[in-house]
Amino acid sequence: MLTIKNLRKRYGNFQALDGLNLEVADGELFGFVGPNGAGKTTTLKILAGLLVPDEGEVEIGGLDVYSDGKELRRRIGYVPDFFGVYDNLKVSEYMEFFASCYGITGLQARTRCHTLLEQVRLEDKEDFFVDGLSRGMKQRLCLARALIHDPDLLILDEPASGLDPRTRVEYTAILKELRDQGKTLLVSSHILSELSELCTSIGIIEQGRTVLQGSMDQIFARINSSNPLLISIFSQKEKALAILKSHPCVQTIAVQGDEIKLGFLGDRQDEALLLQQLIDADVMVSSFMREKGSLESLFMQITEHEEERAVLKHEM
């Protein structure tokens, strides 16, 4: 669906994008993660046709973002981080105005607008003025507006920013529904815990470059691979410890009651073989798993390394 190659953008002396590469497959809900100033909003504005990069290639659905800009705007829905609404319009008028911008009028427009307002839980607000909506309602209204022409790719820049916890949960539920309907979504966000539950893939950007990209399964496999292995022993603990002390993948052992925590440098196959070895030795194992890591910890680890490299580069 989306391919970005060697994308660069400079604002004066500031290099916002420095050779960014990104791949988003059709039907994915892709989380675009990075600290403030990493280049997320600049990237999304280029995708939406609001900025022209200095160099690089961008294709969306096989169309070039430069030469096919007019057609691409019909295939993209864009929800910016700061959005404008027409406060003196009613919700239904607001939706029908944007429908008319895409040539959708009359009964078709009214039907389409009502369907989308139902999808974002605003069907009972059609006759309300936009000015009377809460911030969360306005953000849902802008999401409905971005969907009005049934885009192939939906781009959202910090969509949950400024929302209270309840409203954020409601908004996230709508995005999950769109994902389950097969929509391709590119979501920029700082709320990493929600992205880990919501997304099918993520990309982490730092200083204008992609530092990590992959499916959520791949990302969590990387997170958990360096975490301790936790084993609960029901019986034969001494026999289990003897096996663990002689195992080549075991680096450290910490025992607390029937719980054993291992520094284990092995992959999933090594874990399976160790478990089988314990069972074959008549050790009764009640639980055997890696300690779960978090997207936040991986993000901090990666971006800290990037900051160190940036300092070294500056000093050189």
Predicted segments with their positions:
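Conserved ABC ATPase signature
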Residues: 129-133
